[in-house]
Amino acid sequence: MFAVIKTGGKQYRVAANDLIKVEKVAGEAGDIVEFAEVLMVGSTIGAPTVAGALVTAEVVEQSRGRKVIAFKKRRRQNSKRTRGHRQELTTIRISEILTDGAKPSKKAAEKKAPKADAAEGEAAKPKKAAPKKAAAKAESAE
């Protein structure tokens, strides 16, 4: 069975175990991501999306595409400009295509939440205030 998903402003035709490169998706290698914008599953066409359909995928790697050079030259003006751009891409492997609100066999990992809690715990501990020097001078003057 195949599905058409929408991510990064583009549409991709995917099937189970497909390996595709899409625009950057948040996550590290090994994370599970879910695509809820499923436009078509098999012969079922959504309007605009198929209700209850979900595609899960595993992030294989985060990479960058080839460099695209934007070169502009104004003839006879001694004026030119060169700029380069490398698009960030994510390689994903499609795990499952689910329909009718079925639950994925692997849950999407939420690793970022514990890291944020640990950072908040460290930030919540106030540092001890330095002793006031003005008070120390006042005591020595007496």
Curated annotation (Swiss-Prot):
Compositionally biased residues, Basic residues: 73-84, 126-135
GO MF assignments: rRNA binding; structural constituent of ribosome
Stretch list, region Disordered: 73-142
InterPro entries per the UniProt record, alphabetical: bL21-like (IPR028909), bL21-like_sf (IPR036164), Ribosomal_bL21 (IPR001787)
Keyword rRNA-binding: yes
One GO cellular component term: ribosome
Residue runs in coiled coils: none
Gene Ontology biological-process entries: translation
UniProt keywords, alphabetically: Ribonucleoprotein, Ribosomal protein, RNA-binding, rRNA-binding
Family from the record: Belongs to the bacterial ribosomal protein bL21 family.
Record-linked PANTHER family: 50S RIBOSOMAL PROTEIN L21 (PTHR21349), LARGE RIBOSOMAL SUBUNIT PROTEIN BL21M (PTHR21349:SF0)
Record's function text: This protein binds to 23S rRNA in the presence of protein L20.
Full protein name: Large ribosomal subunit protein bL21
Source organism of the structure: Brucella canis (strain ATCC 23365 / NCTC 10854 / RM-666)
Gene: rplU
